[in-house]
Design a protein with these regions (language model features):
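Generic recognition of short, well-ordered alpha-helical segments
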Residues: 21-25, 53, 83
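Local sequence-structure signature of Cys/Sec-based thiol-disulfide redox active-site neighborhoods
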Residues: 1-35
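Non-catalytic, surface beta->alpha helical segment in thiol-disulfide oxidoreductase systems
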Residues: 67, 72-100
Length: 100
């Protein structure tokens, strides 16, 4: 059975982070391509206590520290930067094609 949802985490410092805003804008731009409810995302704000906790969890899950900024797809580091729309869209399609 293939995935029906992709969960992305944007690892960034949220306050005043232009790259974080860019990543969200790109996600909002490509989301309609996949249909409603397929893409979910959250910002892991390394400038906040809760974000640092999740950052530590992701470091353990991914077996390495995610770069700041980076994009994690279904708990796998997909990009150590903010990709363009085409690259992110392709990565989401690949994640959807994987079996659950």
């Amino acid at each position: 059975m293939k995935r029906t949802e992709v969960f992305l985490e944007i690892v960034a410092k949220k306050k005043g982070c232009m790259l974080c805003d860019l990543a969200i804008a790109i996600l909002e731009e490509i989301a309609p391509e996949f249909g409603e409810g397929v893409l979910r995302w959250e910002v892991v704000d390394v400038g906040a206590r809760e974000g640092l906790r999740r950052f530590d969890e992701l470091t353990e899950i991914c077996s390495r520290r995610p770069a700041v900024p980076s994009i994690i797809i279904n708990e796998i580091i997909a990009f150590d930067n903010i990709p363009d729309m085409e690259a992110l869209s392709a990565a989401v399609r690949e994640a959807l094609s994987k079996k659950v």
